[in-house]
Curated annotation (Swiss-Prot):
Main location per the UniProt record: membrane
Entry membrane topology: Single-pass type II membrane protein
Cytoplasmic membrane side: 1-3
Biological role: Essential cell division protein. May link together the upstream cell division proteins, which are predominantly cytoplasmic, with the downstream cell division proteins, which are predominantly periplasmic.
Protein name: Cell division protein FtsB
Periplasmic side: 22-111
A Gene Ontology cellular-component term: plasma membrane
InterPro entries in the record: Cell_div_FtsB, FtsL/DivIC
Record's subcellular location: Cell inner membrane
Region (Disordered): 89-111
Membrane-crossing residue ranges in chain numbering: 4-21
Stretches assigned to coiled coil: 31-64
Length: 111
């Protein structure tokens, strides 16, 4: 009886191996599902990027507004009857108190 039980237990383990660890087993299916989810997310990001790029291409092909905007912001170009004005942030205020003079040459600070 013990021999039959041991044999059936080994047979059960042999049957379980492909289910969990074999080709097409649960672990591989779970891993593939994670990969598919990651790829779907990447595809959605790329679709959104492509849609944005298609809109830019359409604007560049159909009108001069997009070209003018790029020339102004990316290349700093202006029209003939315009003047270029650039606003610069004010420099940070410096301290009004002067720094102490450096020690005379030849003397070292003792700690």
């Amino acid at each position: 009886m013990r021999l039959i039980t041991l044999f059936l237990l080994l047979l059960l383990l042999a049957i379980q191996y492909p289910l969990w660890l074999g080709k097409g087993g649960w672990l591989r299916v779970w891993d593939m599902q994670k990969q598919v989810t990651a790829q779907n997310q990447r595809n959605a990001e790329l679709k959104q990027r492509n849609t944005k790029l298609e809109g830019e291409v359409k604007d560049l092909k159909e009108g001069t507004g997009a070209i003018e905007e790029r020339a102004r912001y990316e290349l700093g170009m202006v029209k003939d009857d315009e003047g270029f004005v650039q606003f610069v942030a004010p420099a940070p205020k410096t301290s009004e108190t002067p720094l102490p003079p450096p020690p005379p040459a030849g003397q070292q600070a003792h700690h």
